[in-house]
Amino acid sequence: MAKNIQAIRGMNDYLPGETAIWQRIEGTLKNVLGSYGYSEIRLPIVEQTPLFKRAIGEVTDVVEKEMYTFEDRNGDSLTLRPEGTAGCVRAGIEHGLLYNQEQRLWYIGPMFRHERPQKGRYRQFHQLGAEVFGLQGPDIDAELIMLTARWWRALGIADHVSLELNSIGSLEARANYRDALVAFLEQHQETLDEDCKRRMYTNPLRVLDSKNPDVQALLNDAPALGDYLDDDSREHFAGLCKLLDAAGIAYTVNQRLVRGLDYYNRTVFEWVTNSLGSQGTVCAGGRYDGLVEQLGGRATPAVGFAMGLERLVLLVQAVNPEFIASPVVDIYLVAAGAQTQSAAMTLAERLRDEMPGVKLMTNHGGGNFKKQFARADKWGARIALVLGESEVADGTVVVKDLRSGEQTAVAQDSVAAHLRTLLG
């Protein structure tokens, strides 16, 4: 017997029972994005490797350790996308979407990072991102955060996420802070683990993200990033906080929040939760005003965020179990024997014409009434339509409410209106 081939570790199948809740959550997210004027952009899964090295930073964990990079048959270095912003910026430059224009874009799809798989964190994961180009004021930063807050309310998880904010300033301000932080860390190298010692010179701001409790205690005495901000960044951040206060959105200023990608400046934010065990990030983003120019375009202000859908699905299931998937089937059509199957299929097509969007399944494969009603239950149908020889002869169909058990014979010409009433 041939050996079974299984999915790659950390790359999961999502089966019909799971995809239904994904579809409902994604539909909610997309509806909110549309209400704020965002348009979808669809991007390649594979990009040229230099795109991510230039955008994310060569000395980041993503580029150094986590990217799936390979050489194609032409000898070009290609990479499965580890995040979406770089590809979105590349597409905007390539197609002339960004120069002197305001754009509000969103994308959704799989991303890839070679990490240790754990709950809610996989090597192939799904991300929804939104990016705004051409606007530089704190008002658009605030609106992006308001958009995400509206998501949480729509999904019933608003009480289980909290917002952390910071400003990491301009490139110049960050360079000054970097020097001060390195000088501090050099004086306390005995407390640093090997990872922090490596990062101290390659990307010292990442030391602020260390989970090592000894390093965290040391950082309590480290220079504060907020003390090195330029005046424009201070004003921008104060404006953002004022707008969030006016909108009633609670937040905590976390001066150790820096984000793991090099392209960020000024505003950075994360929505975090404690409802999945240890604290985890649900959604994160910030401003990246230099990235478009860095990738070959003209200087363009930009801000955006991304959200891991696996973790979001887990959170919704954990704290709002009433947010259930829509049933696969609204109506199940039961046919009494092979001689009525053609009439049943004709009626089903007619109802699909008259009731766009209805989820209607016709029984196939025969079976007595008991078996067919069991199938209707399996698919979660609310209503069964029963068509026998007598109903075919007199142009009626029996409509049975599978919740109440009530049933009535209805003329086929008027059954669509009757079904609309029952389905609400």
From Swiss-Prot:
Keywords: Aminoacyl-tRNA synthetase, ATP-binding, Cytoplasm, Ligase, Nucleotide-binding, Protein biosynthesis
GO annotation terms (biological process): histidyl-tRNA aminoacylation
Record localization: Cytoplasm
Reaction it catalyzes: tRNA(His) + L-histidine + ATP = L-histidyl-tRNA(His) + AMP + diphosphate + H(+)
Keyword ATP-binding: yes
Protein EC: 6.1.1.21
CDD domains on file: HisRS-like_core, HisRS_anticodon
Enzyme class name: ligase
Keyword Glycosyltransferase (UniProt): no
Gene Ontology CC annotations of this record: cytoplasm
GO molecular function, one term: ATP binding
UniProt family annotation: Belongs to the class-II aminoacyl-tRNA synthetase family.
PANTHER family from the UniProt entry: HISTIDINE--TRNA LIGASE, MITOCHONDRIAL-RELATED (PTHR43707:SF1), HISTIDYL-TRNA SYNTHETASE (PTHR43707)
NCBIfam families found in the cross-reference section: hisS
HAMAP family given in the database record: His_tRNA_synth
Complex formation: Homodimer.
Protein's name according to its UniProt entry: Histidine--tRNA ligase
